């Protein structure tokens, strides 16, 4: 089950309309609609936490392990990092879709990918020309 399905299920159990949930979470009704349609994913962990609280569930349940990794990437590196990690997660999930990989093994693979992404990003900093480096990146 993915985020959009879990969100619909829990919202139905809580007897909340999209508008009421949006008001509680501090987002627009259209945002909740996009989440449920799967055309948008929440990257801000604070929004996911408000939704989870309103639905009496956890962020871990709503997002699943891969969603948490993407949300953490957004917190750590912004929207581009979140998109990169989300793309990696989608590709890896697709590779394992036909096989019999346990949930724990898939979660381990996602964690390893996340770690590898951040290590590569850190090592790549030394190849960035000085004129493009931020003040905090210079050594």
Locate predicted features.
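Helix-turn-helix-like N-terminal two-helix hairpins of bacterial/phage DNA-binding regulators
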Residues: 1-72
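Interfacial/linker helices and their anchor residues that mediate assembly or domain coupling
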Residues: 68-139
